[in-house]
């Protein structure tokens, strides 16, 4: 309770120091672009047989945007303009990597491996050209990518559960996902990439940010974008990590 209150106060203080305006602005911002949640369409029916009535809407609809999805979305945005001739621009809060399930399994769930989300897109049905549509939308100022995280799974917790024989997570793993309606063996949400599990190594959080931002900078051809607030709120000795990484990758960063 006290920790949550502390984080809320810190968030408000950070926002108070930020930019403000009296203009009425509509912000189009959407999370988790690039991250898998549901399996590829080739395995989705098996997944839905296993979990036929999930209460969580993300387990019904949350998946990578296909070429058809993106074409419809960007076509809709292109048809809309303000009185200055500007299109709406969507902020894609981007997750830059997904687990490499094959390599993780080969290691006996002892080592974590990831692949850039652009490689994931190539493997998913009807997604091979999706990233080209991203790049076109960036060039046409229909979309603006922003770093949201390396991957959207709590890696230390997930691997520990797999090594301990959590059958539900092992079954989901074979379908190419970690998402199950409820992981009853832990109070930590598997989606919460940076939540604590026992004593996580100091290097895990630093690697998460360093490697994630490196992938992000590479995929947007060297641009420098902002870090999402989800990686800012850490306690104790880890407080310096976001500052260090932000200064390295965001040329406009100020304390």
PLM feature spans:
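Catalytic alpha-helical scaffold of carbohydrate-active enzymes acting on polysaccharides/glycoconjugates
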Residues: 2-255
